């Protein structure tokens, strides 16, 4: 654990049961923690920073992360957190249950423009799992890899922690591998429950849609991560809710 991380945890303990807040600042000497005062009217439920604190942190160096805590709460960013994180364009570090959970500033999961290898179905899959607290590797994937003798999804699911489950046992957060104009599975979607899936297909924005007969026919297999727990879908759901109210 770094000195910065130790300072973050100590500040969160001092502030509890109120939420702590602050910044990680990079200077020529290295990274350090810049604690702020939570001026929220309900500090046990929300945090708010004074503009003066933000300016003071910027004067110290480059702000590289925003930090706050969820005392007694959940280790995922809330709906409000995600909305504000996207606006801030910063990584957010969340203190919860004595640990620091670090979230990259990924775009909202819905409404993304498709670009193969940059913002495609695997990017959506990876970013959704990141928000749920599970890290997935990024890897190069050439155009039309499924037509060039590669089977990237099936070759990598087990090595990245997934195991296959029966389609009849689908739970929110499971990953559907589909054959989209291909004889091998070349498309991933996240099952959201209630007959809905979240995915990103070429020439469309990423979206939630019904798991219709069309997609059921295209489904090759269903996979679940060994570290998955049902509550982890909260991290994904909160982003979907934030995006639906984002203005």
Where are the language model's segments positioned?
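Glycine- and charge-enriched low-complexity intrinsically disordered segments
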Residues: 209-247
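Surface-exposed patches in mature extracellular/periplasmic domains of secreted proteins
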Residues: 136-141
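Conserved beta-strand-loop surface patch within small alpha/beta domains used
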Residues: 1-65, 71-104
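Extended, compositionally biased flexible segments
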Residues: 58-74, 205-206, 210-221
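Active-site nucleophilic cysteine motif
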Residues: 116-132
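...with weaker cross-activation on analogous glycine-rich loops/strands in unrelated enzymes
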Residues: 142-206, 212
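Second-shell loop/turn segments in exported
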Residues: 110-115
């Amino acid at each position: 654990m770094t000195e910065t991380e130790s300072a973050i945890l100590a500040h969160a303990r001092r502030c509890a049961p109120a939420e702590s807040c602050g910044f990680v600042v990079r200077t020529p000497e290295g990274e350090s923690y810049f604690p702020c005062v939570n001026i929220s009217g309900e500090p046990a439920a929300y945090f708010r920073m004074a503009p003066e604190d933000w300016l003071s942190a910027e004067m110290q160096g480059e702000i590289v992360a925003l930090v706050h805590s969820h005392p007694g709460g959940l280790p995922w960013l809330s709906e409000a957190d995600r909305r504000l994180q996207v606006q801030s364009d910063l990584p957010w570090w969340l203190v919860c249950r004595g640990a620091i959970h670090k979230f990259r500033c990924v775009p909202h999961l819905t409404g993304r423009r498709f670009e193969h290898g940059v913002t495609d179905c695997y990017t959506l899959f990876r970013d959704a799992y990141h928000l749920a607290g599970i890290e997935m590797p990024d890897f190069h994937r050439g155009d039309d890899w499924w037509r060039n003798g590669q089977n990237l999804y099936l070759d990598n699911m087990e090595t990245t922690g997934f195991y296959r489950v029966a389609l009849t046992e689908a739970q929110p957060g499971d990953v559907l591998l589909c054959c989209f104009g291909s004889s091998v599975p070349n498309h991933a979607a996240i099952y959201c429950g209630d007959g809905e899936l979240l995915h990103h297909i070429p020439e469309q924005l990423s979206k939630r849609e019904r798991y219709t007969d069309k997609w059921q026919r295209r489904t090759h297999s269903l996979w679940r991560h060994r570290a998955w727990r049902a509550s982890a879908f909260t991290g994904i759901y909160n982003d979907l809710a934030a995006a639906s109210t984002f203005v």
